[in-house]
């Protein structure tokens, strides 16, 4: 089943593959929600020598606190003895291993090891991940850019073009 640690391992394999390509230039990491957590922790593990810059969109560092609380996206469970899986929206299921690994995930501790340029974009109207989780990334990454978008939701549904523009401008500036 999917866990954050095995998604980080997958991200490292993708990085290794990209770096093996003869035409590969500098590598950036970007991710939305849980993908932002994975991008931040992978960048922390690989370091600024390997990852030129990072962009996080509504990074879901809340997932650890959710697991500790026993409430992930509205699905409730005993955090000390999670079931085999919990039912999420639609037909989505979250497995026991995900909850158990999320419970003690060193999200900010690992991400903090990254010292390169970073950009965090988060909305004040995010009902899934409070924007304070994005602010905390800004606090652990001195010199990072923080864009707090007023009333923007978790999917940036009304601000998509603005998010794309901020992301592209940042990547163009930092991947030269």
Regions inferred by a protein language model and the residue ranges of each:
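Gly/Ala-rich beta-loop-alpha elbow adjacent to hydrolase catalytic centers
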Residues: 31-35, 39
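Catalytic nucleophile-loop/oxyanion-hole region of alpha/beta-hydrolase
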Residues: 1-24
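Active-site phosphate/pyrophosphate- and oxyanion-stabilizing loops and adjacent acidic/basic residues
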Residues: 16, 40, 135-136
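The alpha/beta-hydrolase serine catalytic core
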Residues: 2, 44, 49-136, 140-148, ...
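Conserved active-site and cofactor/substrate-binding residues in soluble primary-metabolism enzymes
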Residues: 6-9, 38, 162
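Alpha/beta-hydrolase fold nucleophile elbow
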Residues: 22-32
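Short, hydrophobic alpha-helical segments
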Residues: 18-19, 171-176
């Amino acid at each position: 089943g999917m866990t954050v640690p095995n998604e980080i391992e997958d991200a490292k394999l993708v990085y290794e593959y990209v770096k093996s390509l003869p035409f590969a230039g500098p590598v950036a990491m970007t991710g939305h929600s849980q993908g932002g957590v994975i991008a931040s922790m992978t960048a922390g593990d690989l370091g600024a020598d390997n990852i030129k810059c990072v962009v996080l969109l509504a990074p879901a560092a809340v997932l650890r606190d959710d697991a500790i609380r026993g409430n992930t996206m509205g699905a409730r469970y005993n955090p000390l003895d999670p079931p085999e899986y919990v039912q999420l929206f639609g037909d989505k299921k979250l497995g026991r291993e995900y909850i158990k690994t999320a419970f003690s995930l060193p999200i900010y501790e690992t991400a903090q090891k990254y010292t390169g340029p970073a950009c965090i974009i988060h909305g004040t109207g995010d009902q899934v991940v409070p924007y304070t989780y994005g602010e905390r990334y800004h606090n652990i990454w001195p010199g990072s850019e923080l864009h707090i978008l007023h009333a923007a939701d978790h999917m940036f549904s009304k601000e998509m073009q603005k998010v794309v523009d901020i992301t592209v401008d940042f990547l163009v500036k930092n991947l030269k």
